[in-house]
């Protein structure tokens, strides 16, 4: 009888401890304690919003174990923010394995920046997966590591250009610009000024001043007044977008017109 009472008392104590740990969400706490992943995920987010990071870690880890993939990412991000790259990598991997694109991207960041180990091959692998899942920033980052190479990855400018184009398709202005440069200069792709013009135009129209400058130069280099006039217009667009270099080039081009 005494043993039964002791076991009951212990069970009550555990329940009370759980309630206290997860207060002020006792219902979620109870459901989470019983293994309900959705409740653990909700509880973890609640704890995060209240600044209770230890409670959040406990709840999110249970949610992650129960198959809540977004909680795996949230937990990875929490550890990442604390500077614990090793634990961040564990939970980013768990979420990436469940096709959470941003988690694959963050994992690629850890490898690219050397916070786990500096391994561009691993970074590229995770960026490509995130890119394939529709995360445009990862397409851009995959292009960057392929363009430079190193740290276990052979440079491949042709691959870099293809990923810059995919990033551009996803609306990233710097990807459009870099793809434009590749076609303009013949880096990793056949030199194609018409294709460069299209890519620069898209980037410039999205507010990327350097693309406006390069587009302006393409028109000016045609050597006729109409081309110069169009080029001036694109450079002015870069200036209007706040690009100081564009403004300087614009003023210089206007001076050239006045001298003629």
Please name every model-derived segment:
Residues 37, 53, 85, 120, ...:
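TPR-repeat structural position
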Residues 50, 82, 114-117, 154, ...:
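Structural motif corresponding to the intra-repeat A-B loop/turn of tetratricopeptide repeats
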Residues 237-260:
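Terminal, low-structured helical/coil segments at or just beyond the last alpha-helical repeat
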């Amino acid at each position: 009888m005494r043993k039964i009472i002791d076991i009951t008392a212990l069970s009550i104590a555990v329940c009370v401890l759980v309630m206290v740990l997860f207060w002020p969400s006792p219902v979620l706490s109870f459901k989470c304690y019983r293994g309900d992943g959705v409740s653990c995920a909700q509880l973890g987010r609640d704890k995060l919003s209240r600044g209770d990071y230890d409670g959040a870690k406990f709840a999110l880890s249970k949610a992650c174990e129960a198959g809540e993939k977004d909680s795996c990412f949230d937990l990875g991000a929490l550890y990442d923010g604390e500077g614990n790259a090793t634990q961040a990598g564990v939970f980013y991997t768990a979420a990436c394995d469940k096709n959470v694109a941003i988690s694959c991207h963050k994992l690629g960041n850890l490898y690219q920046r050397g916070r786990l180990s500096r391994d561009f091959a691993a970074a590229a692998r995770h960026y490509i997966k995130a890119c394939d899942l529709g995360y445009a920033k990862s397409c851009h980052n995959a292009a960057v590591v392929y363009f430079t190479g190193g740290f276990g990855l052979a440079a491949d400018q042709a691959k870099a250009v293809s990923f810059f184009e995919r990033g551009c398709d996803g609306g990233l202005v710097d990807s459009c610009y870099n793809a434009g440069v590749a076609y303009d200069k013949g880096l990793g792709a056949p030199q194609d000024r018409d294709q460069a013009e299209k890519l620069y135009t898209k980037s410039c129209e999205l507010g990327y001043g350097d693309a406006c400058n390069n587009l302006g130069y393409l028109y000016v280099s045609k050597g006729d007044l109409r081309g110069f006039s169009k080029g001036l217009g694109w450079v002015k667009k870069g200036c209007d977008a706040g690009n100081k270099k564009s403004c300087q080039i614009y003023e210089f081009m206007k001076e050239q017109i006045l001298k003629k």
